[in-house]
């Protein structure tokens, strides 16, 4: 398979170090960290060439890598905004107001679920349990978790991210 994606020098070195942590016959086990690395290098999403590249690097069929990428919600197969807002909508968060948090996000950002703002700054998604049920409702924005959210706290967060934390 030919690809249009390659790791940059820094990430190639990191990928090689990750692969070395696994026995030679088990290097396919490095699929999760390598897909994550590819996604981070590519601005938060995994195009087909990146999945192909990782599969080739791990000497595994593309379809196996694709199955992993589509199974885990942490991988995005479509472009996402600079800030990916993921609202947990499972039962504990829903009981504590995740629907209201979602509505605030939609209203404040002017988009619906699974959409990205025109300026490519925000993407709004729902996500399955983030494992912080005791502090529901929970939202993940990129790599950061925000717990015990209220509508007011969510509005403030969106304002801070809108301004790239400059104020």
UniProtKB/Swiss-Prot annotation:
Reactions this protein catalyses: a quinone + NADH + 5 H(+)(in) = a quinol + NAD(+) + 4 H(+)(out)
What are the names of the required cofactors? [2Fe-2S] cluster
- Which superkingdom heads the taxonomic lineage of this protein's source? Bacteria
**Which Gene Ontology MF annotations are present?**
2 iron, 2 sulfur cluster binding; metal ion binding; NADH dehydrogenase activity; quinone binding
Query: Could you tell me what the cofactor note in this record states?
Result: Binds 1 [2Fe-2S] cluster.
Q: Does the keyword section mention Electron transport?
A: no
Keywords, alphabetical:
2Fe-2S, Iron, Iron-sulfur, Metal-binding, NAD, Quinone, Translocase
For [2Fe-2S] cluster, which residues are the binding ones? Answer: 88, 93, 129, 133
What is the protein's known function?
NDH-1 shuttles electrons from NADH, via FMN and iron-sulfur (Fe-S) centers, to quinones in the respiratory chain. Couples the redox reaction to proton translocation (for every two electrons transferred, four hydrogen ions are translocated across the cytoplasmic membrane), and thus conserves the redox energy in a proton gradient.
Task: Tell me which family the UniProt entry assigns to this protein.
Answer: Belongs to the complex I 24 kDa subunit family.
What's the protein here called?
Answer: NADH-quinone oxidoreductase subunit E
Where does this protein come from, organism-wise? Rickettsia felis (strain ATCC VR-1525 / URRWXCal2) (Rickettsia azadi)
The upper taxonomy is:
Bacteria, Pseudomonadati, Pseudomonadota, Alphaproteobacteria, Rickettsiales
């Amino acid at each position: 398979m030919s690809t249009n994606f390659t790791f940059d020098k820094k990430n190639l070195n990191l990928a090689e170090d990750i692969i070395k942590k696994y026995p030679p016959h088990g290097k396919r086990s490095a699929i999760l960290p390598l897909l994550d690395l590819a996604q981070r290098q590519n601005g938060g999403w995994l195009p087909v060439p990146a999945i192909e590249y990782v599969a080739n690097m791990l000497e595994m069929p593309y379809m196996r890598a694709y199955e992993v990428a589509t199974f885990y919600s942490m991988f995005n197969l479509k472009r996402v905004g600079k800030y990916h807002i993921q609202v947990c909508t499972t039962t504990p968060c829903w009981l504590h107001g995740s629907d209201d948090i979602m509505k605030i996000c939609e209203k404040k950002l002017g988009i619906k679920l699974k959409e990205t703002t025109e300026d490519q700054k925000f993407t709004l998604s729902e996500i399955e349990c983030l494992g912080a049920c005791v502090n529901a409702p929970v939202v993940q924005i990129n790599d950061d978790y925000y717990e015990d959210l209220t509508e007011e706290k969510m509005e403030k967060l969106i304002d801070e991210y809108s301004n790239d934390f400059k104020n």
